[in-house]
């Protein structure tokens, strides 16, 4: 046991000599050793104390140095695997990943013309913001995506394909004193020669199919202020649910995509047709 803990090989005789030199009585045969310390050694209370005495007399500097070993291998979560697959898919489609701040301006949803009564205005407000531009937690990623696209356009970047995976935050509408709802979201932004509604749709389809989402439907949407009314669609998939009358198919909305409305694009300084999805 002593040799195993210390990682060394000391004979029983050597250990006995160490203990006896400290005026301890040793009994037992073979691997069993019973050690009785003198009454003055009140600090010797357990097996580990005896092992420490052997290490001290043997010489701490002689003990081998080893890296601690763990029994359990670290594993990556399913959520992380999904995000990594989404990243790999978008990069394979020629998109660059961007990262933007979670603290944003409430004017962002105004700029993309979100309805006044929309849940996307249920902000988590910062108590001590550095300024209005960082006074709330974001509920959507699209404003930040359009800002990045606008900066690239102002620097004469001919084409952009970008995506972001990030958290969004929303006040608990049932009880504002409770912790906010935090969700993962993804935004995509394209502009440039050859880009149109259908290239974005193809990228969205490829992404969702890679993530194992089948039975996709793109439902025309004319009332979403961010997008051109004739070039916008809600992204949905069919899921099977079991109701009182047995299995039922139900459409589950996953997101929205389309050509950004010219008025919205102008606010971000984008002077060409651009396309976004979230």
At which residue positions do the language-model features occur?
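Extended beta-strand-rich architecture
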Residues: 1-278
């Amino acid at each position: 046991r002593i040799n195993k803990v210390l990682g060394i090989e000391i004979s029983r005789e050597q250990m006995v000599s160490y203990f006896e030199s400290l005026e301890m009585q040793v009994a037992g045969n073979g691997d069993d050793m019973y050690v009785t310390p003198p009454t003055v050694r009140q600090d010797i209370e357990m097996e580990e104390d005896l092992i420490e005495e052997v290490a001290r007399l043997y010489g701490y500097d002689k003990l081998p140095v080893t890296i601690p070993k763990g029994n359990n291998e670290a594993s990556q979560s399913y959520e992380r695997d999904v995000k990594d697959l989404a990243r790999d898919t978008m990069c394979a489609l020629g998109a660059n990943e961007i990262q933007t701040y979670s603290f944003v301006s409430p004017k962002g949803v105004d700029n993309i013309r979100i309805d006044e009564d929309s849940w996307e205005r249920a902000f988590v407000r910062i108590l001590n913001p550095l300024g209005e531009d960082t006074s709330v937690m974001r509920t959507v990623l699209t404003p930040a995506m359009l800002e990045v696209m606008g900066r690239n356009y102002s620097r004469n970047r001919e084409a952009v394909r970008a995506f972001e995976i990030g958290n969004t935050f929303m006040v608990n509408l049932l009880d504002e004193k409770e912790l906010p709802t935090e969700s993962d979201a993804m935004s995509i932004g394209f502009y440039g020669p050859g880009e149109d509604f259908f290239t974005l749709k193809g990228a969205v389809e490829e992404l969702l199919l890679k993530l194992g989402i089948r039975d996709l439907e793109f439902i025309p949407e004319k009332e979403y202020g961010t997008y051109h009314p004739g070039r916008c669609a809600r992204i949905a998939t069919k899921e099977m649910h079991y109701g009182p009358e047995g299995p039922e198919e139900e459409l589950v909305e996953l997101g929205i995509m389309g050509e950004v409305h010219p008025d919205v694009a102008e606010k971000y300084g984008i002077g060409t047709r651009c396309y976004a999805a979230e």
